[in-house]
Amino acid sequence: MMIPSGECTYAGRKRRKPIQKRRLTMGTEKSNPSKRHRDRLNTELDHLASLLPFSPDIISKLDKLSVLRLSVSYLRVKSFFQALQETCVWSAPALSPEDHSSRGFPVQEGRLLLESLNGFALVVSAEGMIFYASATIVDYLGFHQTDVMHQNIYDYIHVDDRQDFCRQLHWAMDPPQVVFGQSPHADTDNTVLGKLLRAQEGGKGLPSEYSAFLTRCFICRVRCLLDSTSGFLTMQFQGKLKFLFGQKKKTPSGTALPPRLSLFCIVAPVLPSVTEMKMKSAFLKAKHRADIVVTMDSRAKAVTSLCESELHPKLNYLAGRSNGENVISLFRGQTDRSHWTRALARSSCLCLRGGPDLLDPKGTSGDREEDDQKHILRRSPGARGQREMHKYSYGLETPVHLRHLDWSTEQRSQEGTTKLTRQPSKSEPSTCLVPHGSCVPYPGSQGMFSASNMASFRESLDHPTGTYCSQMNRPLPDIHQGQVDPSTCHIPQGSLGSRIPLSGMQCFTARGFSTEDAKLPSLPVNIGTPCNPVLSLEVPIKMENESGSQDIVEASTTSCVWLGTGDMTRRHLVGFPARMHLKTEPDYRQQVCTPHRGHGILGTNPHSRDTVGSCREHAPLYSAHCTCLSPEPPHHLFMCSHSESQHPSLDQDCRAPIVKREPLDSPSWAAPGHVTVPRMFPKNASITVIPSKGSDGIFLP
C-alpha cells in the first residue's frame, strides 16, 4: 500500500454503535427476502465478533466493517505465528513448573512485558499497513487497538513526515517509484531479499553485512488524541526490518509472492525540550523574577565617589530582593547575635556616628518581635509588597581622638549679626562643658546668626555629604559595633511623626544604601534608645521665639542645622517650609537639628582625661530622612578607652520638647500620605531658636 493521494486526511475515532436488533414476532406479516438476508448477515457478524480476542464492551461498540477488518487482521497475525513455527526459526522454550500458577495456567508474560515498555509495540508491513499494534497504544496516542489494526499507517503520520516514513520501510531507504498496482520489486531488490530470506529460513540469521541496513531508529510526528494543542505527538521508532511470514500474497497472475520486509519496532514518546515543557507544577507556574539583584543606585555611587569596579568586591555591596510592588522598603542585616533582623527604611533608626552600626530596636527579643514586626507590616494599608535589602559587615576604622572645640564670638552691631569662628585647640584631646540644647556647625564652616537667629553658611563645604533633606542615599562611615551602650532614657509615645521602631536594641551593620518611597502608617514609639524621638522631614515646620529672646545670641546656646559638606550639600540644603508652626517651650532645653556624620553630643564627667590609648567617638546615629529631637529624661552616653570607661554625671539633661500645633491661614499639616520631602529652604522660611539653660556636653569633630 502506498501513500494515499489527494486531500490530506487523518484518522479519527469514528466507531459507530451497532443498531440494536429486535426479534420479529411470527405473525401475519409478509416475508421479505432481503430482510431475511440482512438478518442472517447480522447474525453471522455477531458470531464473528464474539470470536475476536476483545472484551464484550469493546465488541459491542464495533460496527460491521470494523468486525470484518479486525477479523482479517486477527487471521493474518495468527498465520504469521503459524508460519514461524513451521519454519522453525526459533523453538519455543519448555515451560518450567514455576511458570505455572496454582490453577495450572501459564503466566501471561506478554502482558507484563507490554506494561513494562516505555511505549507500545508496532508492526508495519512494507505497504504501510499496520499489521499489529499493542493494546498499550491507547495510553500514548489515545487510539484503541481496534481503531488502528489493519489500518493505513500514513493516516496517522504527519503529512510532512510521510515521505521519510516510507523511506524507512525500504531496506536500502530508497523505495522505487512504481505505478500503483504493480509490484514494487526490482531485480536488485529481488536478489537482496532472496539472499536474506534464504539465510533466515535456514536458521542462520541475517548476514552481518546487511544488519546495518535493517536497523531503524527515526522520529516522526504521530496523530494523538490526548494532545489538544497541536494534535500530534513526536514519537521515536526504534527496531529492525524483518520478514513477515505467512501472508501468502499472490500476484495478479496467481504467482505466490515471497515474504516482505516489515518494520518491527517499539514506539516511544520523545521528551520535549526545556523550552517546550509545560509549566504544570505550581513552582514552575510562578512568575519568574531575579532572586538576587546586585545593582546599585547611581546616586549612591555619586555620593560615595566610587566606581562600579570599586563597589563590586566590597562585602557591603548591597543585594536587593523585590517581592511584589515596592510599597514598603525594608532593610535586613545580620546582628551581632548571629540572626537576621529587619528595619523599616522610612522609619526612624538609631545609628552610631563614624561607623556602619545600627541599633536594632527588636534584636534583643529575637524572633518573637520579628514576627510582631511582620504582623505590623501586614496590617498596614500600604503593605502590598516588600523590598528587603541585605547588608553585610564592613571594615572597621582605627580609633580617633576626641578634640576640644574652641569657639569665639564676634559681634557686629551695624549688621546685627554674630560671626562664629573656631579656634584651633592647643591642648591634648579632652572633654569640654557645653550647655545642652546647642550644637555647632560643621567643622571648617562659618555660621552667621543674625538677631532673628537665622543661620546661614558662607564658606564652601569641603567634606563628604552627611545628612541632608532628600530621598537620596546616605553613606555611613565605619565604627566598631560595641562602642556604644544604649541608654535607658524615656521616649514620649506621641512624638511627632511616630516613626519609631519597636523596643529593644541590637547592633547590626549597614552602609550607604538607597531606598524607595514607602507608604506606612505610624509605628510604635521606641523606649530606651538615645535621642530617639524623631521629627520626619516630610512635615514642614516653623519655630517661634518667645518674647525677649531676640537679643540673646550665644554660640554655645543656639540651635542650628547640622549639614554635611561637599557638592551634594550645596545642591541639596536642608530646609523647613514655612507652612506650619512648631512652638517649643524654653523650659525643656530643646534641640532641633539634623544629624550628620561628623558631629555628636557626648555627656561625660567634666574632670575626665585622656587615658592610655585613643578613645572612640560615640554619638547616636539617625536616619537620613528625619530630624532628631533630644529625648525627655537624661540619658548617658559614655566614652570607652582601652583602660576604663568614664560615665557622665546624672545631672545632665536631655529632654524632648513639647510640641504645640497652631493653625495657620495657609494650608495646615500635610496629609498623612504625603511623602514628598523638600530639598531646599524656601526663601521666606526662617528657623528661630530659643536659648536654653546650659548643660554639660562635648562636641566631637
From Swiss-Prot:
Spans annotated as Needed for transcriptional repression: 555-701
Protein localization: Cytoplasm; Nucleus
Induction remarks: Increased after TCDD exposure in liver. Highly increased after TCDD exposure in kidney, spleen and heart. Up-regulated by 3-MC in small intestine.
Top-rank lineage group of the source organism: Eukaryota
GO biological process: negative regulation of DNA-templated transcription; negative regulation of transcription by RNA polymerase II; nitric oxide metabolic process; positive regulation of protein sumoylation; regulation of transcription by RNA polymerase II; xenobiotic metabolic process
Keyword Metal-binding appears in the UniProt entry: no
Biased composition (Basic residues): 12-24
bHLH domain mapped to chain residues: 25-78
PANTHER family: ARYL HYDROCARBON RECEPTOR, ARYL HYDROCARBON RECEPTOR REPRESSOR
Name by which UniProt lists this protein: Aryl hydrocarbon receptor repressor
Species in which this protein is naturally found: Rattus norvegicus (Rat)
Gene symbol of the encoding locus: Ahrr
